[in-house]
Design a protein with these regions (language model features):
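Short, surface-exposed alpha-helical segments at coil->helix boundaries
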Residues: 227, 250-254, 392, 415-422, ...
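Short, contiguous acidic/charged loop-to-helix segments that flank catalytic cores in large enzymes
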Residues: 265-266, 382-387, 412-414, 441, ...
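A conserved nucleotide-sugar
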Residues: 237-239, 396-427, 431-432
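Short acidic (Asp/Glu) and glycine-rich catalytic loops that position anionic groups and cofactors
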Residues: 159-160, 283, 374, 399-405, ...
């Protein structure tokens, strides 16, 4: 036992030095499976997934190591660490290998048998949130982020994830979002002022506006809402700077760079460097297109990057930041008596808060499909994350009330949560009326799929925006439910501006 303990101490030092291959060799050559403690199994698995030669085989072997370590010493700290890494590595392998099939029930059973010992365990909660994200179970995902918040074991990313996923939760009122936003603002790290450059107060010959985004690539939805604006601004009065926070770039990115006066990339910059880099641009206005969404720079924005900061498009709710001056909305989304529940001052565009640029594709007018089908077809091409139990209940009732009607559900993320959705629709007795479709290879084929739909159904409380504009562009009306805040009234605003309310 003493020799194994000594070996483990030596191996821990090698691991810190990132000599992963040597750690793997020493453990596998000097110990047998049955000799290894949970901590040694964990070290072996971590070395396999940290190694430069990481692949499907190494991940699979790491899974075996983590599982072995968990089962050897259940409910000990080392075993719980193994479980966290087992779950995380399972999700990683799922994402890397399209054909990889994993038994989610095993993960969930392991977790439930250990839950009371790890309610406040940060890696476990993060890992289980990843699992429920892929199972399209927002309610349980939220639970694990809530535990992180309550245990005070969180960072800014956890806070943003929790706030973002609450947008899928009908039980949160706008006052809850407002209070959480204040909590987030109070708990973000503050950059000492002596580390920051001064914000320029001298007006320049033109108004300089920065747009901050991680999503100017790959045909991301935000590009369709931003393109017309950047193509038509008055270059005599304005200078536009794209501030990109993504290491990737494609032809969409290049096209957008050609539309503006300047582009900078802050992906590799820490918050202090990023704030100073942006302050050096001498912006009059910074428009954040991300809010709480993935790859955001919320900590940077807390420290103010321009004279005025505005949240728009990418996140349809309050950020809670005291330094976020404005939120762009419209009268349909935020009522005047609700402004108190938004940390930002509301800028009301007269009709609609944003507009889609459409597509460079020829549209062919088609008759409604029910004329040839002799039955009515509903459809939703929204992300499956937005389809909760209440949405399923409402849609199921619609199918039951309209004789022989059908429903087409289509999403690019169909892999892991599909069986859960099918089970919920089956419970409601309508599964046989539903067709599930995956991602189309060509975007034109995605749009043409709308020709199979008579009416598009919107999700709630998290409305579709891009999918609603797509449906309308293809001549398909959208049935939406009136909401209670910005996020849940997007469909309402779109329809009201079309005179379809």
């Amino acid at each position: 036992m003493v020799s194994l303990q000594k070996l483990e101490i030596e191996l821990q030092e090698l691991f810190k030095q990132k000599q992963y291959s040597k750690v793997i060799f020493e453990i596998t050559s000097q110990t047998e499976d049955e000799e290894r403690s949970s901590s040694l199994c964990n070290l072996l698995g971590l070395s396999r997934i940290s190694n430069d030669n990481k692949n499907k085989d190494s991940l699979s072997m790491a899974l075996r190591d983590f599982k072995q370590g968990y089962l050897k010493e259940k409910n000990t700290n080392h075993a719980i660490d193994c479980l966290a890494n087992f779950i995380t590595s399972s999700v990683l392998l799922m994402d890397l290998e399209k054909d990889y099939k994993f038994d989610f029930s095993e993960i969930i059973n392991f977790y439930e048998s250990t839950e009371k010992f790890c309610i406040n365990h940060r890696p476990i909660n993060l890992a289980m949130a990843m699992v429920y994200r892929r199972l399209n179970d927002a309610k349980k995902l939220i639970l694990h982020f809530k535990r992180l918040i309550e245990s005070k074991k969180f960072d800014s990313k956890d806070l943003c994830n929790y706030g973002y996923w609450r947008c899928f939760d009908k039980d949160w009122k706008q006052s809850d979002f407002f209070n959480f936003g204040k909590f987030l603002d109070q708990n973000l790290k503050v950059i000492p002022q002596d580390q920051l450059e001064e914000i320029s107060k001298e007006p320049g010959p033109k108004i300089r506006i920065g747009f901050l985004s991680a999503d100017i690539l790959g045909g991301h939805s935000i590009t369709y809402f931003l393109k017309t604006i950047l193509s038509n601004y008055d270059k005599k009065k304005f200078e536009i700077i794209l501030i990109l926070n993504n290491p990737k770039e494609d032809h969409f990115t290049k096209n957008f760079k050609d539309l503006v006066d300047e582009t900078i990339d802050i992906w590799n910059l820490d918050n202090v460097s990023a704030v100073n880099r942006v302050r050096g641009l001498k912006l009059d206005i910074m428009i954040d297109l991300m809010g709480y969404t993935s790859m955001n720079r919320i900590e940077m924005l807390k420290s103010r990057t321009a004279r005025k900061q505005i949240i728009w498009m990418g996140y349809c709710n309050t950020t809670g930041l005291t330094n976020m001056d404005y939120i762009i909305s419209d009268p349909n989304l935020i009522r005047s008596n609700e402004e108190k529940f938004y940390a930002e001052k509301v800028i009301y565009l007269p009709k609609i808060w944003n507009s889609h640029c459409g597509f460079d594709l020829e549209r062919i007018e088609n008759p409604p499909p029910f004329l040839k089908n002799k039955f009515f077809t509903f459809g939703s091409f929204n992300n499956f994350d937005k389809i909760n139990s209440d949405v399923i209940s409402v849609w199921s009732n619609i199918l039951k009330k309209i004789n022989n009607s059908k429903l087409i559900l289509k999403t690019s993320k169909i892999k892991h949560g599909l069986e859960r959705l099918k089970a919920l629709f089956k419970e409601n007795g309508v599964l046989e009326s539903i067709t599930f479709m995956g991602r189309e290879k060509e975007f034109k084929d995605h749009l043409n799929a709308y020709n199979e739909i008579d009416i598009a159904l919107d999700t709630f409380p998290y409305n579709g925006v891009t999918t609603s504009f797509e449906a309308i562009w293809m001549g398909v009306p959208v049935l939406t439910m009136a909401g209670y805040n910005f996020n849940s009234r997007c469909g309402e605003s779109i329809n009201k501006n079309l005179g379809m309310d």
